[in-house]
């Protein structure tokens, strides 16, 4: 059983909690800026307005803060939109987080100064000196995952043992996972 923090209460972050909880992990979710998702996640029934379903009663919600990031977690999942990557990168760097990170966010970032394109994992390493970053990508829709429809993803980390540990912690009969050491390739192809 792992202690997992999911940062981002949108559709994918919230849907991702379903297989995590089904795999007997202790899951906490936080939402840095959307009042709608905070309302959804703190309601008694935990009805998620985007997913159109009630999330597990086992799911804990905690207010986002630097202190929350300093708590002991086995895995921190980043499920923010691309525009939230700089925000969370700064927060994780400030909190001196050493916990393994799993990035669900899709997209590439164009750096105007150098006219280069970076993947999210490259950006987090380069700009915020964050290490031990895994990425999870695949043809997985949030609503399908939340409804436990069978879907598949790939977890990539240069250290395949970490990718496999994460996979073992979150895989279910409906959430099938493959692994790769090609982090950039998996990110670019998502």
Predicted regions and their residues:
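General small-molecule cofactor/ligand-binding pocket signal
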Residues: 28, 60-62, 134-136, 178-180
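Glycine-rich beta-alpha junction loops
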Residues: 33-34, 108, 137-141, 159, ...
């Amino acid at each position: 059983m792992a202690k997992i923090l999911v940062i981002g209460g949108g559709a994918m972050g919230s849907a991702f909690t379903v297989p995590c909880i089904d795999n007997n992990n202790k899951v906490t979710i936080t939402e840095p800026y959307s009042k709608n998702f905070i309302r959804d996640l703190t309601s008694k029934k935990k009805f998620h307005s985007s997913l159109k379903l009630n999330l597990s009663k086992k799911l804990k919600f905690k207010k986002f803060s630097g202190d929350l990031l300093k708590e002991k977690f086995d895995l921190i999942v980043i499920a923010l939109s691309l525009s939230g990557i700089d925000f969370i990168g700064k927060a994780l760097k400030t909190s001196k987080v050493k916990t393994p990170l799993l990035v669900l966010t899709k997209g590439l970032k164009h750096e105007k100064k150098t006219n280069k394109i970076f993947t999210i994992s490259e950006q987090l390493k380069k700009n915020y000196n964050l290490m031990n970053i895994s990425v999870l990508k695949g043809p997985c829709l949030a609503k399908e995952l939340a409804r436990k429809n069978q879907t598949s993803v790939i977890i990539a980390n240069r250290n395949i043992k970490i990718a496999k540990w994460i996979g073992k912690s979150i895989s279910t009969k409906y959430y099938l996972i493959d692994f790769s050491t090609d982090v950039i390739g998996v990110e670019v192809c998502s």
